[in-house]
From Swiss-Prot:
Subunit structure: Homodimer.
Leader sequence residues: none
Alphabetized InterPro entries for the sequence: Histidine_triad_CS (IPR019808), Histidine_triad_HIT (IPR001310), HIT-like (IPR011146), HIT-like_sf (IPR036265)
SUPFAM superfamilies: HIT-like
Motif mapping: Histidine triad motif: 97-101
MF terms (GO), sorted A to Z: adenylylsulfatase activity
Protein name: 14 kDa zinc-binding protein
Ranges for domain HIT: 3-113
């Protein structure tokens, strides 16, 4: 299991900002902006990263993005925010349980790096 599995099972504490039956959202412990929240599916179902997505994952992928919008609104990010999914070694993915980064609260730059 990954660290996210332990966060879902409450073995490891986190600062939860949103939770429903499918998605858990919590503050990143190394924030890259004033607001930095991770959104994860509660059930991994083989979805370790976006490249591993299959047709059966369409609903949860959409749910993650819609939940990111809900959390952004809850966090007051009306002026904008960034959504990031790091995928695979070259994408700097560090935990192999798909997760969405919601980053905001400051002016973002482009290109990101």
């Amino acid at each position: 299991d990954t660290i996210f599995g332990k966060i879902i099972s409450k073995e490891i504490p986190s600062t939860v900002v949103y939770e429903d039956d499918k998605v858990l959202a919590f503050r990143d412990i190394t924030p890259q902006g004033p607001v930095h929240i991770l959104l994860i599916p509660k059930v991994r179902d083989g979805l370790t990263g976006l490249f591993k997505a299959e047709e059966r994952h369409i609903d949860i992928l959409g749910r993650l993005l819609y939940t990111a919008k809900l959390v952004a609104k809850q966090e007051g990010l009306d002026e904008g925010f960034r959504i990031v999914i790091n995928d695979g070694p070259q994408g700097c993915q560090s935990v192999y349980h798909i997760h969405v980064h919601l980053i905001g609260g400051r002016q973002m730059n482009w290109p990101p790096g």
